Each structure stands twice: as C-alpha cells, then as structure tokens.
C-alpha cells in the first residue's frame, strides 16, 4: 500500500511604512493513511496583519483651554467682552508600533466513503500585538492652565495650575486567542429524489484581552479641582465568546422546468459571552499632576479599598461593575433561508432568495439584567439576482 505524502512550505515578505518589515512562514502537510478513504492533514503559519491608515497616520490631539470667558457677563459692554483660549497640540507618536501577527495551527482528517465525504479540522489561533487605540504613560502631559479675570486694573492672572491632558495612541496592546472545531459532511446527491445534502458546523471559543494599564481620572473640569490620575492593572481582565452552530443545506433539482431549490436550516445550539476580572478595583499607582511622572505603589501594599481610603487615595477608587462576569447564554434558536434559481438559458439565470424566511425573532431574557430581553437572529430580507454569462 502506498501512502502519499504531500507538503508545502513558503514564506511571505511584507514591507510597510512606519511598521517596517516582516516575514510570514507557512507549512502544510497531508498523508493518505488509507488511499481513497482516509487522510490526515495539518498546517502551521504566521500571517501578518497590516495596520490601517488610522494606526499608520494618526491625527494630532488637540486640547482647548478657556483662559477667560466674558461672553455672558451683562455687566460688561458687549463690544468689550473677552473670550480667550489656549490651544495645545500634541503629535500622536506611533514610532513603536509593530506589525500584528496571527499564529495559526490546525490538524484534521478527511474520510471518503462512496459519495459521502467528511472533513474535520481542529484549529487554534493567537493574534499577538493586535492594534488598538490606548492610553499609555506617554500620552499624559502636564499643561499649565492660566485663568484670567477682569479687575479695576484690567485683565489679571487669577490662577496658574497644572492639569493633565491625555489622548489615545496606536498601540499593540490587543491579544486574541481563538480555538475551535469545524466539520463538513457532504452526503452527495440522492438520485431517487434529485436532492443533495450537506451538513457543516463549527464550535468556536474566543478570548480577548489587553496588555498595559488602564487609567482613571476622577477630576472635575475646574483646574483647581484636578487630581492625580490613578493607574490600574489590566492583568486578569478578559472577555470570552463561545458558540456552536450547524447548517443543513438541501439542494433539489427540477430539470423539467430548470429550477434549483436550495433550503438552508441553520441551528445556533449554543451562544454565550462573559468576562473575567483581575484586580481592577485597587489602583497600583498614580500619575502626578505636576509633571505626569509615574508613581507605582509597592506591590501588595494595598489589598482592600479601605486601605486605599485610609492612605488618602480614596478619590482614585473606580466604582467598577462585574455584571459582565455573569455568563450570558441563549438556548437554541433556528434560522431558515431559501434560494430558488431558474435557468432560462445557458447564458441567463435568475435567482430569488429570502433569508430568515419565517421571520423568526426569538427573545431571550438576559441573565445579567433580569426583566430585559434580547432579540436574536438575522433580520428578514429578500431579493432577486440576475446572472448573465457571455
């Protein structure tokens, strides 16, 4: 018995302004364990995800500070009222941006018995250095906010106080892990009823999280009320999504009148989402108001919110909600689609389609917010397609 072995390997080269150069390798292999019956396949590769223009060429950040505003002061003649502002412009730096990489490994098998063909693939993906707009230590800057007022001696400086200005910049802080299983079962055409059946489905679970730190500013707008900005760790914070979907497709031929009718039944057996949280209620440090310097607390110094309050940092506490830790899941629901194609000639074909043809919109009560309901399924829509082959 001959066992055929096939393999492919390659590498892709990409060069993009700002983010530079990257090589993306890929290897695939398959072997026929039982010729014309059973084969195994696998692969591993790294795909480069290039940043969009938003991340390559971000716009500058602009801040407008009102130094004096007399527009609504009726005690001053309208022609003498002053309105003066200072505009601060920060260049958004993305020189440290890297090319995101998606690592994917997969393994599966293909089984052929007569007209029936079954293909099953298990895979795992990991997106590293994904793009996201985030605040970092470098996006906070101290600005001296000068305010003026009118006195008997004219316009005088009334206060000169530091404020922290911030913006979001392109970062590589996003990470996504996906694992799943896909299958495709093609039963083939049953000649007695002129109908072909195909079943496919997938189970998928996705985890996404961000690196770096998050920041909480509990200050009011007035310059005199500005406070240091709290630093929070994002370690342990993650969001999850999971679903299991199958699709049954039946294609029926009516040769006498040139009709092809395709009915698709999609079943969403399981769909859920939830979040996990780390230490998102205790700050790990703060940014000083005077110079935006980073001041980290000794590790483990504060373990309770009361300890933070007793140390005089109560204003840094962020009222967080862990409502999303409750797993939101929905019982099975279904969607049916129809496609009818008429072959008028060898050159012309007309198709009518209707998605969610029964207008099924199941409602499920939210587990996080009892009493509120979520409407599921795609919206109903239909249309006509005309295909002309020349």
Predicted regions: what they are:
Residues 47-127, 147-154, 161-190, 239-244:
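Outer-membrane beta-barrel signature, preferentially recognizing the C-terminal barrel domain
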Residues 1-3, 27-31, 107-113, 122, ...:
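Residues on the lipid-exposed face of transmembrane beta-strands in outer-membrane beta-barrel proteins
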Residues 1-30, 350:
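Surface-exposed extracellular loop regions of Gram-negative outer-membrane beta-barrel proteins
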Residues 4, 124-126, 143-278:
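Gram-negative outer-membrane beta-barrel transporters
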Residues 48-49, 127, 267-319, 330-333, ...:
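C-terminal beta-signal and adjacent terminal beta-strands/loops
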Residues 11-17, 31, 35, 44-50, ...:
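Transmembrane beta-strands of outer-membrane beta-barrel pores
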Residues 1, 13, 21-23, 101-105, ...:
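Residues that define the transmembrane beta-barrel architecture of outer-membrane proteins
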Residues 4-7, 36-40, 115-118, 191-197, ...:
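Repeated loop/turn-to-beta-strand initiation elements of outer-membrane beta-barrel proteins
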């Amino acid at each position: 018995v001959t066992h055929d072995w096939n393999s492919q390997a390659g590498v892709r080269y990409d060069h993009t302004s700002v983010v530079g150069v990257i090589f993306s390798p890929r290897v695939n292999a398959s072997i026929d364990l039982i010729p014309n019956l059973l084969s195994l396949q696998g692969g591993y590769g790294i795909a480069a995800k290039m940043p969009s223009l938003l991340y390559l060429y971000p716009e500058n950040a602009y801040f407008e500070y009102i130094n004096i505003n007399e527009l609504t002061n009726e005690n001053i003649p309208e022609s003498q009222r002053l309105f003066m502002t200072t505009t601060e412009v920060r260049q958004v730096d993305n020189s440290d941006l890297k090319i995101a990489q998606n690592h994917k490994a997969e393994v599966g098998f293909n089984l052929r018995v007569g007209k029936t063909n079954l293909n099953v693939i298990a895979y795992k993906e990991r997106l590293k250095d994904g793009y996201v707009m985030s605040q970092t230590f470098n996006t906070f800057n101290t600005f001296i906010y000068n305010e003026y007022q009118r006195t008997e001696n004219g316009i005088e400086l009334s206060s000169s106080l530091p404020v922290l200005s911030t913006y979001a910049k392109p970062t590589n802080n996003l990470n996504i892990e996906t694992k799943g299983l896909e299958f495709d079962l093609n039963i083939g055409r049953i000649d007695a009823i002129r109908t072909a059946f195909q079943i496919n489905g997938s189970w998928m679970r996705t985890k996404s999280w961000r690196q770096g730190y998050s920041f909480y500013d509990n200050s009011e707008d007035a310059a005199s009320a500005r406070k240091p900005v709290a630093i929070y760790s994002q370690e342990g914070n993650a969001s999850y999504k999971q679903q299991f979907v199958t699709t049954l497709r039946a294609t029926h031929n009516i040769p006498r009148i040139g009709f092809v009718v395709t009915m698709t039944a999609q079943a969403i057996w399981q769909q859920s989402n939830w979040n996990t949280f780390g230490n998102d209620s205790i700050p790990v440090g703060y940014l000083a108001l005077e110079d935006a310097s980073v001041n980290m607390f000794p590790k483990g110094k504060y373990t309770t919110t009361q300890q933070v309050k007793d140390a005089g940092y109560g204003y840094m506490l962020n009222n967080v909600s862990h409502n999303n830790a409750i797993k939101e899941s929905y019982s099975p629901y279904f969607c049916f689609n129809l496609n009818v194609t008429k072959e008028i000639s060898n050159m012309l074909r007309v198709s009518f389609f209707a998605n969610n043809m029964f207008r099924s919109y199941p409602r499920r009560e939210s587990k996080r917010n009892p009493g509120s309901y979520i409407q599921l399924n795609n919206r109903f829509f239909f249309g006509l397609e005309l295909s002309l082959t020349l």
